[in-house]
């Protein structure tokens, strides 16, 4: 009897709802019964695999809107076999490849114009326009920006990368220490709070190392010096934004190997999360072995954005 009453309540809510929100796979849950949805809108559609995108579509969809960016990260696929079978490709990307007409939103309201400058030219064919001006995105205090009119910087660090205990991920102690110092100074200036800063890195071992560093060096819990600070992987920041992003690249080796950091979509995500300031931390000699990273570093050097003075001494 309790289950019947509960289902009646759920049915009442669903029957009165004009919009039902769920994940793609969640739209197939039995709680929705046989309900049909003639209009389906899938947000972050480029991160959904084709099978998961089909789940809401088969519920009577007559009008489908896919919203996403195929120049950013694709669906996360752990299995190599699944990736080889095509599960790493989204329905969004397939339809674009088939020539389906698209509508691009060309005005961005997140980034300081200088942060937008490189990804706009490199990844979006110069089509992006700014819906905010420089005065609305003042450079944060607490960091010595090489050019205060352009709150973008690359901080060179020499220390080598290392494998974690399981040998499955990579970390870099020197880059972690420099990143810690940058965040500490940004917060000390009083212009930002912990939740305004995002620390981004491509490797889970570096996420763990830096989380421990911030926890032990001031505390991430409520009342701690770094409360509100988020340390996440690049994949964990897609679709999100912060006032300042500090991107710790990790890779540093004499062979010039950068692994999946060479994925231009991963770089695009990392450098487009920041509103007021973007700080990159890394080993330029290693990163320069990759064409996409070489392009970004050349751009930064040409504009005088290399922060050689940070993290020294």
What are these regions (language model features)?
Residues 1-15:
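A substrate-engagement module of RecA-like helicase motors
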């Amino acid at each position: 009897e309790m289950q019947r009453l509960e289902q009646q309540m759920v049915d009442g809510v669903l029957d009165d709802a004009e919009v039902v929100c769920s994940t793609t796979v969640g739209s197939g849950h039995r709680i929705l019964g046989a309900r049909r949805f003639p209009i389906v809108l899938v947000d972050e559609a480029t991160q959904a695999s084709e099978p998961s995108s089909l789940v809401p579509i088969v519920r009577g969809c007559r009008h489908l809107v896919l919203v996403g960016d195929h120049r950013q990260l694709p669906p996360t696929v752990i299995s190599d076999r699944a990736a080889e079978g095509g599960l790493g490709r989204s329905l969004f990307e397939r339809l674009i490849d088939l020539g389906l007409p698209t509508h691009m939103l060309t005005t961005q309201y997140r980034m300081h114009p200088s942060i937008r400058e490189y990804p706009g030219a490199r990844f979006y064919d110069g089509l992006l326009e700014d819906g905010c001006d420089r005065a609305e995105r003042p450079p944060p205090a607490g960091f010595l920006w090489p050019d205060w009119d352009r709150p973008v910087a690359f901080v060179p660090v020499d220390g080598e990368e290392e494998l974690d205990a399981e040998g499955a991920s990579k970390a870099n102690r020197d880059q972690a220490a420099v990143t810690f110092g940058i965040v500490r100074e940004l917060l000390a200036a009083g212009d930002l709070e912990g939740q305004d800063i995002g620390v981004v890195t491509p490797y889970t071992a570096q996420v763990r190392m830096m989380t421990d560093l911030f926890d032990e060096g001031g505390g991430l819990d409520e009342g701690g010096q770094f409360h509100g600070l988020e340390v996440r992987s690049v994949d964990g920041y897609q679709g999100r934004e912060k006032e300042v992003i500090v991107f710790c690249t990790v890779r540093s080796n004499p062979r010039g190997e950068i692994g999946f950091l060479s994925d231009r979509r991963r770089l695009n995500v990392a450098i487009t999360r920041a509103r007021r300031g973007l700080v990159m931390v890394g080993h330029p000699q290693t990163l320069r072995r990759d064409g996409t990273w070489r392009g970004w570093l050349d751009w930064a050097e040409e504009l005088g954005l290399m922060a050689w003075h940070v993290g020294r001494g």
